[in-house]
Amino acid sequence: MASLHFPQWAVSFVFFAQAVGSMDTFIAAVYEHAVILPNKTESPVSTEEALLLINKNIDILESAIKLAARQGAHIIVTPEDGIYGWIFTRETIYPYLEDIPDPEVNWIPCRDPRRFGYTPVQERLSCLAKENSIYIMANIGDKKPCNATDPHCPPDGRYQYNTNVVFDSKGRLTARYHKYNLFEPEIQFDFPKDSELVTFDTPFGKFGIFTCFDIFSYDPAVVVVKDTQVDSVLLPTAWYNTLPLLSAVPFHSVWARAMGVNVLAANTHNTSMHMTGSGIYSPEAVRVYHYDMETESGQLLLSELRSRPRQHATPAEVNWSAYARTVKPFSSGQADFPGKIYFDEFSFTKLTGSAGNYTVCQKDLCCHLTYKMSESRMDEVYVLGAFDGLHTVEGQYYLQICTLLKCQTTNSRTCGEPVGSAFTKFEEFSLSGTFRTKYVFPQIVLSGSQLALERYYEVSRDGRLRSRGGAPLPILVMALYGRVFERDPPRLGQGPGKLQ
């Protein structure tokens, strides 16, 4: 039997926040859900059998939703694939799908469940929102029939979409979003012809929505923030952590800071697939996060956020190459060597002392590092790495990355492999690069995959990620992760289908 694990400190915090809050602030909740998965099959199950599995998952989500509502939460986000999992073909997912109408129809499924056919999942979610007076965001599947008059209609005569839905506190369907940037294994779904910029207004700010892999792309992730001026983003995800550079919590939290919005990120929980890492992030700080590779339990997180963070002072825009372009490359007297991180070939140079200045370059990108360790350990090796190129595995997107990281062993061939702990502590550091993009996401991950607290580091206006002093930090990885959107390849094909 699945169980819920709710941190006592999070619940206690919310009691305080509820007492002092107003609609200038709101209580956000996210739930990291250990999804009950279907048995793998090559033949579709019946609609009744599919609904049985869906309801088992919603039973767990219901407990989290009710507890969040009792603690004063105004909105809760649940994960991508959170009600049926991800082990599907195009045919086997079909019994799990419902026809989800455009929210403009002004529909409360809890009151009128048969208005758009058989929609038990939408009815149950609507009733949960209505009965608990809370906004609920859930990820479900949408189906839309098509025919030969549509040149993009799939051979089976239907579109199938990975879909986010939001029900407001009265149970009304208030938002629907079809995922645009499908992850390569999502063969069960189509992507819409055009990206959808989906927003909705609440008494506690304006919200935007996208899903998991969308966050890597300009459209819709950056566009919905820039063009619609949302205050907060809802991010359901089924994110498997690919250390050292693509762990959910560091990437989602720094995206919130870089884009100047709140991010409510709910991940699925499956340790066998390295899926964990949910959080509530503001532009100023990480409010609360959860990362757990030890248990198989779900986790509810709650935090108070400003409803309209854009109305508050924001840091000046960073010129990410300003400092680095004034620096003459440091000479270490040793040759660079290649190494791979998530299939991308980096150029690495080894740090050989307890303090120093290093430069490593690849194509147009030169990365500069100045550092001082508390002591140099013989059993731990660190490298400075640079990557400037097109990532081509499980998606295609152009990256410029500068990173300081610990190698898995003292053998340089393990540099770039996942590492869990570090004992070397850095007292001072400054990392910069000659980036050709303004979309650079700085992150620092410490031993045990913990985030470095904001008080220990800063980003200067001239593009340096540098220490502020205080306690020495046991760094696993420090990175400036740049996305060069204008160098991404074009999407192949204009209609629904599998991304190439």
UniProtKB/Swiss-Prot annotation:
Tissues in which the UniProt entry reports expression: Ubiquitous with higher expression in liver.
Main localization (coarse): membrane
GO CC term, one of those recorded: side of membrane
Lipidation positions, renumbered (GPI-anchor amidated glycine): 469
Subcellular location: Cell membrane
Gene3D superfamilies, per database record: Carbon-nitrogen hydrolase (3.60.110.10)
CDD domains attached to this UniProt entry: biotinidase_like (cd07567)
Domain CN hydrolase: 31-307
Family that this chain belongs to: Belongs to the carbon-nitrogen hydrolase superfamily. BTD/VNN family.
Protein name: Vascular non-inflammatory molecule 3
Gene: Vnn3
